[in-house]
Regions:
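Flexible "arm" and connector segments at domain edges
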Residues: 1-163
Length: 163
């Protein structure tokens, strides 16, 4: 599983960044991406509380997609910026509600403007724990999200990408 992640995640990150650049999303102010991140966090919590595993898996991947683009926006295209902390794990699994609570806290920090890498590292680690709890790895969740968005058409309207 780790071997596949080592091969697949850098490719997925590159595809998502290219997708963002083709659509001009990478040039939008990163502050606007925060709203998309919040939307995806909301979908994650909604899926969890409804017990909708398909939407939960999709939400995990969608969050990572929005974070990849967020990092792309505030890092000014610096390559491998996201990949550097993809492999960070924190602690062991402490229970689903613990990791969801940690994501809720991180959501507030991101919304408040904390773009620091440490926040994103913890979000990724918590997302990994949640995915693992359900028998998935986070890379396959991102792959699932990529398959959903890769052919989407849309445009930037008033600084926001709409599809």
């Amino acid at each position: 599983m780790i071997t596949n992640e080592l091969k697949e995640m850098p490719l997925l990150i590159a595809k998502i960044e290219e997708w963002s650049m083709v659509r001009g999303i990478h040039n939008l102010p990163y502050e606007t991406q925060r709203y998309k991140i919040m939307e995806e966090f909301g979908e994650l919590f909604g899926a969890y509380y409804r017990g909708n595993l398909e939407l939960l898996k999709d939400s995990l991947g969608d969050i990572v997609v929005t974070l990849i683009i967020y990092v792309q926006q505030f890092s000014n295209g610096e390559r491998n910026f996201f990949e550097e902390f993809w492999w960070v794990d924190k602690d062991e699994f402490k229970g689903l509600s613990y990791h969801l609570d940690q994501i809720a806290t991180s959501t507030n920090l991101i919304y408040a403007g904390a773009s620091g890498i440490w926040v994103l590292r913890y979000v990724i680690a918590d997302l990994k724990h949640i995915a693992k709890h359900y028998g998935w790895n986070l890379t396959e969740c991102v792959e699932h999200a990529w398959e959903e968005i890769k052919d989407r058409k849309g445009r930037v309207v008033d600084g926001v990408w709409v599809h």
